[in-house]
Design a protein with these regions (language model features):
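Glycine-rich hexapeptide-repeat left-handed beta-helix
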Residues: 1-25, 59, 65-67, 73-88, ...
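Short proline/glycine- and basic residue-enriched helix-capping loop/turn segments at helix->loop/beta transitions
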Residues: 93
Length: 189
């Protein structure tokens, strides 16, 4: 390597662990940041992207992440030991440092930064839990509803303009994933 060349791109694989013989299943087009941790029965769909320092721990039930869904930096996703697994649909955005536990996030759901979604909760298609919101056990956010607070409560149904704004997040992260896949490399001063 000459002084002017950069190291080759990092092959993104994250830290992957089997648990009791069950390994993560990662679609070839999904992307996992090198510092993300996936344990056990984690299933990533096409184009799903898991960012830096996320932990997805599927030790007692599966975690399913749908196509093009983005799990942003520092998020923790887990399951419970009963009936509740974590089911994340297609085109879902989960903001930085969220906690998602044994719940269902339907297609195009949006979970804000630092928000928490607890066991048995459901966020229907296009539903939004704002940053630092707390969706309590068993609660349901309806289609295109905006919820906030701790505990979270419904504020209103989002307008078409608001929905369009949130819908920009998924293509942004798909594009960013492609840039990281091609351009992330190690560096030492």
């Amino acid at each position: 390597m000459s002084d002017n060349s950069l190291p080759p791109p990092i092959k993104s694989s994250g830290l992957l662990y089997t648990f009791e013989g069950v390994a993560p299943q990662i679609h070839p087009t999904a992307w996992v940041a090198p510092t993300a941790v996936l344990i056990g029965d984690v299933r990533l769909g096409p184009g799903a992207n898991i960012w830096f320092n996320c932990v997805l721990r599927a030790d007692t039930n599966p975690i399913i992440v749908g196509a093009r869904s983005n799990i942003q930096d520092g998020t923790i996703i887990h399951v419970d030991h009963g009936e509740n697994f974590t089911d994340i649909g297609d085109d879902v955005t989960i903001g930085h440092a969220a906690i998602v536990h044994a719940c269902k996030l339907r297609n195009r759901a949006f979970i804000g930064m630092g928000a928490t979604v607890l066991d048995g909760a459901v966020v229907e298609e296009g539903g939004l839990l704002v940053a630092r919101g707390l969706l309590a056990v068993g609660k349901r956010i309806g289609r295109y509803e905006l919820w906030m607070g701790a505990p979270a409560k419904c504020i209103r149904v989002m307008s078409e303009a608001e929905r369009a704004r949130w819908d920009e997040t998924v293509p942004h992260y798909v594009g960013l994933t492609n840039r990281y896949r091609a351009g992330l490399s190690g560096w030492q001063p």
